[in-house]
């Protein structure tokens, strides 16, 4: 079981939460990015650098993730592919993507892309709040408890 991070767009504060969690859980944490990343020394934490390019990191995460893994991403298509493989998916704001919600999220994403393509300014997400950080940490802990229960 591994935690995969779409690290190019993942906020540093979320990475810090993940570093501490990987140590506490003794769970492999892999940060996938198209640039060099500095991570704390740990036998549980590693980086995987991929070539620059559209969806290269996403495709590598999909290729390597397995059922039971956790994927951290704000990229909805990546989350959908991870869920199809049986992995769990969580965004940096603490929202857990599920098979029941991912289709709706994909539809909304496509709708917003259509609006932007037609010239309508849709704006971006708000900056990450303390509440978002707490929600992320709580949802990560919830996932970990589910993992422990499934192991018996």
UniProtKB/Swiss-Prot annotation:
<dbReference type="InterPro" id="IPR003791">
    <property type="entry name" value="UPF0178"/>
</dbReference>
<protein>
    <recommendedName>
        <fullName>UPF0178 protein YaiI</fullName>
    </recommendedName>
</protein>
<dbReference type="Pfam" id="PF02639">
    <property type="entry name" value="DUF188"/>
</dbReference>
<comment type="similarity">
    <text>Belongs to the UPF0178 family.</text>
</comment>
């Amino acid at each position: 079981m591994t935690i995969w991070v779409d690290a190019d767009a993942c906020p540093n504060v979320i990475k810090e939460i993940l570093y501490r969690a990987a140590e506490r859980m003794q769970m492999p944490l892999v940060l996938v990015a198209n640039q060099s990343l500095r991570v704390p020394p740990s036998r549980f934490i590693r980086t995987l650098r991929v070539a620059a390019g559209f969806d290269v990191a996403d495709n590598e995460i999909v290729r390597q993730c397995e059922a039971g893994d956790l994927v951290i991403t704000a990229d909805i298509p990546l989350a959908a592919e991870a869920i199809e493989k049986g992995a769990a998916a969580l965004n940096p704001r603490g929202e857990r993507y599920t098979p029941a919600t991912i289709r709706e999220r994909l539809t909304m994403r496509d709708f917003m892309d259509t609006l932007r393509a037609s010239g309508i300014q849709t704006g971006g997400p708000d900056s990450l709040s303390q509440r978002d950080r707490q929600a992320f940490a709580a949802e990560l802990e919830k996932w970990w408890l589910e993992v422990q229960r499934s192991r018996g």
